[in-house]
Amino acid sequence: MAGTRGMIALAALAVLAPVAAAGADEPQPAQEQEQAEPLQVTVVLAHPDDELFMAPALAALARQGARVQIAYATQGDVGPGVSGLAPGKALGEVRLKEAFCAAEALGAASVASLNRGDGTLGVNAHHEGSSARKLLADLGLWLAETDMILTWGPDGGYGHADHRMVSAIVTQIAEARPAAERPKLLYVGIPAGSLPPVQEMADWAVTDPALLTENIAYTPADLEAAKAAAMCHVTQFDEASRKGMMGLFDATMWRGKVHFRPAF
């Protein structure tokens, strides 16, 4: 959510690592091996901290047994937030650590950084060698086996160009797949009339509730996981905002479930 600051590789892969792999190599009982494969959920976002916009839903999916993997198109290396750090590689490394912290809190299985340049996805997107073209190639391979994709809607939340481009690129990949192979693609949204009463979110996009036909309900424990994830993003939000953000979202735009609309 780069931009809401006072509130509240394949060679291209710079990072692709499990969040919690304890016991992963231990032999499993035969009956467990025979169980159906877990739901593969891929969350594609622009920057570390974007996951907060749907955080309790991710915790709920992981708790229910889904394998949740989070892919960030960039490391957020030009968004210092409240940190005072200079834009650049060092900031990106810190923000990626924050992303791992948040993913662990939410129970995600893995985090990937595609590292395609914060703030560059909309620059000459149709040109050969552009960040957008490279991201399209990255994700085309990376999304091949997923069952469900969660991402920004066309509005990008509050219109951030990187958010919009991530949504568009993911949609382009999904719409080209035959129906039998197409993953379920869901855009996260804010129901009209439910924006938090804070100035920093006054211009965020809202969606007609009639279109938000998919919802992921969460428990108090999932919300606590989301609160823990928010506390990871020290560079982006002051302490009061980190402590209060998830509770505010829960009381206004979520109310026990995160809202999505199907792309198709």
Task: List each model region and its residues.
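Bacterial N-terminal signal peptides that target proteins for export
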Residues: 1-8
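Metal-dependent de-N-acetylase/amidase catalytic core
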Residues: 9, 25-44, 129-264
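Bacterial N-terminal signal peptides
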Residues: 9-18
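Sec/Tat signal peptide C-region and signal peptidase I cleavage site
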Residues: 20-23
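Active-site rim/loop-helix segments in enzyme catalytic domains that contact anionic ligands
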Residues: 25-144, 172-176, 180
